Amino acid sequence: VSDRYDVAGDNGEWMFKYIKKNYDKNNVYFALKKNSNDIEKISKVGKVIHFKTLNYYLKYMNSEFVISSHVDSYIHKPFGTKEIYINPFIDRKFVFLQHGIIKENLSSWLSQYYKDISLFICSAKAEYDSVVNGDYLFDENTIKLTGLARYDNLVSNKTKPENIIALMPTWRSTLVGGIING
């Protein structure tokens, strides 16, 4: 299970907590880079495995599922160009939890043609319809409308209701400059 290689805190972390709490599987690992600030936090939940280590690659090759909130190549195809030689021997399913709700058409990057996703989680009906009926090329059985794992962790507030306005901006590529590598 993973979020990004350097941090937890997204849907992968909440799915990992859910699996450990409800199934207590000893063979479930959360993947993070060696010097991530989240290692201590995640280690309290379960086993942490470090990205791009021999142990990581061996566990990946022998895994039944790879579950992540991100579908970048370092997670989805960690062997890079060597994947074509290794992938025929790997019988695992990739579960894409997503990071957020898809607003724009991402099918030129996120389609069955480019990503071998076995289960694609959607969290809104409009998003589900867009993916199922759009150019993503996934079989309808691959797409599930379940909501995001981190939303399941929201606490029920049983105190007196308050009138609160929450301003929650989201990231948009059109609002930022170029990507800074680092």
Can you annotate each of these PLM segments?
Residues V1-I67, Y74:
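N-terminal pre-catalytic "stem/leader" segment of glycosyltransferase-like enzymes
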Residues D6-V7, Y74-I75, I102-E104, R172-L175:
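Short, acidic Gly/Pro/Ser/Thr-rich loop/turn segments
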Residues K47-F51, M61, F65-H76, K82-N153:
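Active-site-proximal region of nucleotide-activated glycan assembly enzymes
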Residues N22-D24, I42-K44, P88-I90, L137-D139, ...:
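Short, structurally constrained coil/turn elements
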Residues N26, S63, R92, E162-N163:
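Short coil/turn segments at beta-strand junctions that form active-site/ligand-binding loops
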